């Protein structure tokens, strides 16, 4: 079997346009569209900077619940205020993992792409693909969202030319999370603790 770099070099780069969103702690609103080197599905603490975006809004909301609520036992854990950032994107040279062909080339399964936030093996597999894509000078990765609704766009901000940087078009303060789209009518929300 060919190496991962050799296989991913066969993937056809895609272009991605449209409106995307992300949630951030409100205190980081100014730098919300900057990439960060941090451990996540597509990045590592000591790696290259990544910027996570999602669509539709329901997917971004579920992602907030997956990371802030689902792993916590308290029915209403306290959080700081958050912000929903909306931006427009027009990027090229994206590894498109929505394509079954590219998922086969990357050796990633839908189960790995949509794994629980605590599945370290799935995260390592995705991080490895992102590292190779970055090495091959892709500008990012687009994949089915882990929320199982919508898409995730991960931009490698150190690879983006200035003309492809996301443009902020709106921001909305969340003093509590919107209702969880996975549980319509359930009303389970976060309460905000003022510091």
Provide a role label for each language-model segment:
Residues 1-35, 41-44, 71-195:
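Active-site and NAD+-binding cores of ADP-ribose-processing enzymes
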Residues 41-71:
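Extended catalytic/binding region for NAD+/ADP-ribose chemistry, centered on the ART fold
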């Amino acid at each position: 079997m060919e190496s991962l770099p050799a296989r991913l070099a066969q993937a056809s780069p895609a272009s991605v346009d449209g409106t995307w969103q992300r949630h951030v702690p409100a205190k980081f609103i100014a730098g919300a569209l900057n990439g960060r080197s941090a451990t996540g599905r597509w990045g590592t603490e000591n790696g290259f900077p990544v910027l996570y975006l999602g669509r539709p809004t329901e997917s971004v909301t579920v992602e907030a619940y997956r990371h802030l609520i689902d792993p916590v036992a308290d029915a209403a854990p306290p959080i700081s205020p958050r912000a929903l950032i909306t931006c427009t994107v027009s990027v090229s040279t994206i590894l498109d993992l929505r394509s079954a062909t590219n998922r086969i080339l990357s050796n990633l399964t839908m189960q790995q792409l949509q794994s629980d936030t605590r599945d370290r093996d799935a995260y390592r597999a995705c991080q490895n693909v992102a590292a190779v894509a970055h090495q091959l000078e892709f500008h990012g990765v687009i994949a089915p969202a882990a929320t199982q609704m919508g898409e995730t766009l991960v931009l490698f901000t150190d690879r983006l030319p200035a003309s492809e940087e996301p443009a902020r078009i709106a921001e909305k303060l969340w003093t509590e999370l919107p209702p969880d789209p996975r549980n319509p009518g359930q009303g389970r929300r976060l309460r905000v603790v003022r510091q």
